[in-house]
């Protein structure tokens, strides 16, 4: 397995903050206190697109992921050499399949060949990983760049990474909060590959727009 990805996912679970609180699970009762009742059935968003770019069709039909809420932001700027250094962040919470645990998708588009869905590290770290069955190279005929996709954290997380020709990098993570006994497999890899393929061309033009401060849907 790839230790970094495990650390990244754990950091994201611990640092989710306000967005996580919006869909937190019910607490446990203590001595002399009646246990909390089960959480009500969540309300799933019916939008065709989440975070302006994420197709709900792929989430629902291919990943069995139904979104309860999300937050996103994007910013544009110019680097020292005059090149665009745009950023885009999208965090989605939801349910996967028939399970009641919270599942999360985190998406980050970042300059400087940096992967930053949870904590920053260079794309070149993936190139330098020794060959193994977890890290799978990936490419598409109709888009420029190259990437990897892999399963980590005892099969409880999938990560996809993409390096654009202009050295922006895209990272997508799909994982459970640790409460669900679920193991991802090659079918999930195929679904994540389709999501990556859709987002590679969709995110850059949105990230280059006028800055969008962090926006929650629905607003907590």
Language model feature labels by segment:
Residues 2-16:
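Bacterial N-terminal signal peptides that target proteins for export
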Residues 17-18, 22:
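Hydrophobic alpha-helical membrane segments, chiefly transmembrane helices and signal peptide h-regions
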Residues 24-27:
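C-terminal motif of bacterial Sec signal peptides marking the signal peptidase cleavage site
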Residues 32-220:
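A small/polar (G/S/T-enriched), proline-flanked helix-loop surface module common
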């Amino acid at each position: 397995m790839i230790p970094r990805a495990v650390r990244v996912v754990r950091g994201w679970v611990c640092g989710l903050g306000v967005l996580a609180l919006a869909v937190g699970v019910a607490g446990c009762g203590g001595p002399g206190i009646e246990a909390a009742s089960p959480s009500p059935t969540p309300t799933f968003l019916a939008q065709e697109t989440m975070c302006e770019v994420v197709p709900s069709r792929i989430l629902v039909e291919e990943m069995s992921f139904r979104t309860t809420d999300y937050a996103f932001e994007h910013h544009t700027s110019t680097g020292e050499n005059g090149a665009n250094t745009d950023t885009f962040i999208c965090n989605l919470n939801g349910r996967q399949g028939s399970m009641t645990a919270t599942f999360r998708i985190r998406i980050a588009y970042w300059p400087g060949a940096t992967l930053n869905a949870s904590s920053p590290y260079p794309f070149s770290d993936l190139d330098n990983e020794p060959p193994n069955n977890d890290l799978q190279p990936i490419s598409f005929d109709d888009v420029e760049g190259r990437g990897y996709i892999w399963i980590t954290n005892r099969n409880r997380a999938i990560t996809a990474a993409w390096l654009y020709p202009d050295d922006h990098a895209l990272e997508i993570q799909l994982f459970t909060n640790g409460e669900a006994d679920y193991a991802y497999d090659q079918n999930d890899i195929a679904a994540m590959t389709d999501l990556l393929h859709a987002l590679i061309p969709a995110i850059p033009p949105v990230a280059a727009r006028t800055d969008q401060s962090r926006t929650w849907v629905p607003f907590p």
